Amino acid sequence: MKVKSGIYQQIYEVVRLIPEGRITTYGTIGRIVGCSARQVGYAMASSPPKQGIPWQRVVNRQGCISLRSHGSPDPRQRILLEEEGIDFDHKGRIDLNRFLWQEVE
C-alpha cells in the first residue's frame, strides 16, 4: 500500500501545479510521474476532498471529461472548469490547443 500511496502523492503534487484556467490529461500526468494514465485516474478518484487537489483540471486525451463508474461524467467537473473560464464545444470537448497546460521541463 505504501507504493500506491507514494505514487498517488506524486500525482497530487503535479496536479497541484496546473494553474487555474488550464487543464491537462491523465496521460501527461502519468508521463511526468512514471505511471499509467489509468493509475492517474484511480488517484484522482481517490483524492482526499479537503486537500486542495484541483482534480477537475485533469481530463482525457480527447479533451473530454471522463466517464465515472456510474457511466456518466461528473457534472461538477464541468461546472468547476467553466467557473475557471474553460470553454466546451457542442460535443463537450475542451480545445486542447487553447487550454492545455504544458508541464515545466
Identify the function of each model-found stretch:
Residues M1-E105:
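Nucleic acid-binding interface residues in structured DNA/RNA-binding domains
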